[in-house]
């Protein structure tokens, strides 16, 4: 009897370690990934900050897309943003997955969290959530030359293109929101709530966990009928 208890305890410990490392948990045929805190990429963030680690999420997404057991992915976001390259890379991976994906923004989907919010085949946001849209930023010393600003513009255009390709917002409107000057003190950008995000076409629908799960189940059924859920086959 004690051996059985020890085995159960070992399984529970393994599951807890997996959740802690990957920010994800598998329930039946759906895998839930949480993207929280800051996106950690090329540099290690201070230990007191909550982070989503790029090196954990990338192999996890690969394993999910190759798994025969997992039929759909729910991405839950409450992120401040973080490393631009890593955040965009994660978003690109999710957008290219063949399996049904649904994102749900809770609390916030700020900065590079915006591409992560729209990368799923269907996106939801709760009414109380907010999203901060602003130009690309960099910490540390920069060289004050035209080439530096040209580099920033190229990086920003990559983000704008990805967001517009994976949502219904126009390029002109997104740029205008990024360059707004009367919403954030001593900075440029916009803060929008859940209703505004849907009205602008950035997010598909207002909804919570039940709405996101119901939509994901619908997409899973549809993908079984069509063979996969790549591209727009599962989108409404």
Language model: regions and residue ranges:
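N-terminal organellar transit peptides
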Residues: 1-104, 108-114, 119-134, 138-236
């Amino acid at each position: 009897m004690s051996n059985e208890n020890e085995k159960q305890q070992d399984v529970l410990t393994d599951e807890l370690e997996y959740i802690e490392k990957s920010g994800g948990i598998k329930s039946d045929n759906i895998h839930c990934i949480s993207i929280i805190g800051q996106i950690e990429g090329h540099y290690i963030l201070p230990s007191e900050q909550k982070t989503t680690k790029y090196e954990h999420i990338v192999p996890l997404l690969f394993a999910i897309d190759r798994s025969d057991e997992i039929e759909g992915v729910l991405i839950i976001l409450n992120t401040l943003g973080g490393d631009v390259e890593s955040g965009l890379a994660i978003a690109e991976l999710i957008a290219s997955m063949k399996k049904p994906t649904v994102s749900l923004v809770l609390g916030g989907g700020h900065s590079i969290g915006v591409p992560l919010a729209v990368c799923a085949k269907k996106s939801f946001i709760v009414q109380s959530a907010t999203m901060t849209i602003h130009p690309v930023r960099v910490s540390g010393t920069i060289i004050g030359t035209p080439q530096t600003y040209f580099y920033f513009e190229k990086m920003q255009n990559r983000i704008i293109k990805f967001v517009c390709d994976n949502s219904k917002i126009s390029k002109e409107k997104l740029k205008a929101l990024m360059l707004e000057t009367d919403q954030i003190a001593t900075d440029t950008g916009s803060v929008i709530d859940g209703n505004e995000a849907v009205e602008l076409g950035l997010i598909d629908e207002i909804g919570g966990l039940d709405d996101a799960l119901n939509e994901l189940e619908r997409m899973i059924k549809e993908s079984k009928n069509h063979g996969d859920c790549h591209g727009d086959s599962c989108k409404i």
